[in-house]
């Protein structure tokens, strides 16, 4: 209702299970704005020529883990011992981005590492049978399997301190952004206001759980690490020269024209 009142139009919300579905809906002309689309599917779509633009960061959450085999005795303290070894990474995903950022933070030369492109489930198997020294994983089941034979090379706190995280974006069709910059700007402003009011209170968690069809404990646990960056923080940290959004996009195989992504304030 807040969006309807501020934008002066009826905003129709549609739920999608994946970022890929969001892309398909935008390309079909069914939706104009995708809120909380995964960065990886957005990048993949743009690489394939989809006329989409990233205009904001929806939510930031913990980066994917890279599990190193328990048999090797390698930790963040001696991570350089990974040099010369083989690592499983699902390329062109946020796990790939996390891998590269973690290795940089630990001063590991990835040019010396043999990287094999494996889906998380396959990477977990390779870690278990000793085919790889480390596997970078996403997905609960694969992470659980990898955790049975290995441990994350960096802890949650270490990743946070190093500024390594994953994030979803707000993306739009070029057509909508060009024809309706005012509506888009208002949408982002209303979103900012809602984010600033978020305190993860029991009432807020219950509402999200009800809307998402999830139970309260699961919702609370899943959202415990969520961060909703302010517009000011996004401009300073994500969309500035060499910002996180630019760095992430480059790591995923797409180089934005710096200083950053499309900016609604320039329209």
Regions found by a protein language model. Give the residues of each.
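Secondary-structure end/capping motifs
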Residues: 178-259
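Pocket-lining segment of extracytoplasmic ligand-binding domains
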Residues: 122-211
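Stable alpha-helical elements in mature extracytoplasmic
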Residues: 18-22, 41, 78, 95-98, ...
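Short, solvent-exposed loop/beta-turn-alpha elements that line the ligand-binding surface or hinge
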Residues: 1-9, 158-163, 231-245
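Long, low-complexity C-terminal extensions of enzymes
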Residues: 260-267
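Alpha-helix boundary recognition
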Residues: 27, 46-47, 80-83, 128, ...
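Residues that flank catalytic or metal-binding motifs in active/ligand-binding sites
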Residues: 62, 83, 166-168, 252
């Amino acid at each position: 209702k807040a969006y309807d009142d501020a934008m002066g139009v009826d905003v129709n919300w549609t739920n999608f299970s994946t970022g890929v579905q969001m892309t398909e809906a935008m390309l079909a002309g069914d939706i104009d704005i995708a809120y909380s689309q995964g960065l990886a599917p957005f990048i993949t779509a743009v690489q394939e020529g989809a006329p989409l633009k990233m205009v904001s960061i929806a939510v930031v959450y913990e980066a994917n883990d890279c599990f190193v085999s328990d048999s090797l005795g390698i930790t963040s303290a001696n991570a350089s011992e990974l040099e010369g070894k083989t690592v499983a990474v699902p390329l062109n995903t946020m796990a790939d981005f996390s891998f590269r950022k973690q290795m940089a933070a630990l001063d590991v030369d990835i040019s010396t590492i043999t990287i094999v492109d494996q889906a998380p489930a396959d990477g977990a198997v390779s870690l278990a049978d000793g085919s790889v020294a480390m596997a970078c994983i996403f997905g609960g089941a694969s992470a659980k399997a990898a955790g049975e034979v290995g441990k994350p090379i960096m802890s949650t706190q270490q990743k946070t301190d190093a500024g390594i995280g994953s994030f979803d974006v707000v993306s739009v069709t070029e057509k909508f952004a060009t024809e309706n910059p005012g509506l888009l700007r208002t949408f982002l402003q209303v979103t900012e206001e809602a984010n600033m009011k978020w305190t993860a209170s029991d009432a807020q968690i219950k509402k999200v759980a009800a809307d998402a069809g999830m139970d309260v404990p699961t919702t609370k646990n899943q959202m415990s690490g969520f961060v909703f960056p302010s517009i000011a923080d996004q401009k300073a940290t994500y969309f500035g020269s060499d910002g996180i959004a630019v760095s992430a996009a480059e790591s995923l195989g797409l180089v934005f024209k710096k200083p950053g992504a499309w900016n609604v304030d320039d329209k």
